[in-house]
Amino acid sequence: MSLLVKICGLTTPETLDAALDAGAEMVGFVFFPPSPRHVGLTAARELGQQAKGRALKVALTVDADDATFENIVETLRPDLLQLHGRESIARIRDLKQRFGLPVMKAVAVATSADLAPLAGYADVCDRILFDARAPKDATRPGGLGATFDWHVLEALKLDRPFMVSGGLSADNVAEAVRITRAGGVDVSSGVERTPGVKDCDMIRNFIRAARAAEELSVQ
């Protein structure tokens, strides 16, 4: 299976085009006001139209309420919901039933003990995203540029596709794929000049490095 590449936190037509033209399979839009990558509904509508038919559109939320989800789904028409908060299994099941969309649940990882909830999530989620656990005083759960010990996932047995994120860049994505055997990689801060400001060349370089990692993994 080919490696999926997701560029998350896109906010401008130029950086979105860079991701699409370089072959990203997924493009992520953040709907969380504390994040420097947050997009409003008007911008999301325009970016969604730009990405339509070229990549899967992913809506990232953090413990959003029903009204927020309804606005996002109506405006962006996402292909996948990414839940990055403390959403319960019951909440995830309700969202899937309500909107008829697949769900990717983010699981914050620092040690192997953080993998304990996986059994429950795997029963209801379509995909799992492993991200570095944020510090206790962080104002947002991801996009902080921190990595986690990828060796925690070495012995992982999961009957759902999974991706890795957290501090990925063109310099370390190959090592992350080699160790975790992940089916996809997700980057945000690793392709930015400053928080929330994506760089087109960094996006292209990351995708190029991910493709090289993919080739090595099948040799």
Swiss-Prot record:
| Known catalytic reactions | N-(5-phospho-beta-D-ribosyl)anthranilate = 1-(2-carboxyphenylamino)-1-deoxy-D-ribulose 5-phosphate
Q: Which GO terms describe its molecular function?
A: phosphoribosylanthranilate isomerase activity
Kindly give the CDD domains that the UniProt entry links to this protein.
PRAI (cd00405)
Identify the pathway.
Amino-acid biosynthesis; L-tryptophan biosynthesis; L-tryptophan from chorismate: step 3/5
Which key words are in the record? Answer: Amino-acid biosynthesis, Aromatic amino acid biosynthesis, Isomerase, Tryptophan biosynthesis
Q: Biological process GO annotation list? A: L-tryptophan biosynthetic process
Q: Which InterPro entries does the record cross-reference, listed alphabetically?
A: Aldolase_TIM, PRAI_dom, RibuloseP-bd_barrel, TrpF_fam
Which enzyme class? isomerase
Among Gene3D superfamilies, the record links this protein to:
Aldolase class I
SUPFAM superfamilies listed in its UniProt record: Ribulose-phoshate binding barrel (SSF51366)
Q: What is its EC number?
A: 5.3.1.24
**Family assignment?**
Belongs to the TrpF family.
Which PANTHER family does its entry note?
Answer: N-(5'-PHOSPHORIBOSYL)ANTHRANILATE ISOMERASE
Put simply, this protein is called N-(5'-phosphoribosyl)anthranilate isomerase
Lineage, broadest ranks: Bacteria, Pseudomonadati, Pseudomonadota, Alphaproteobacteria, Hyphomicrobiales
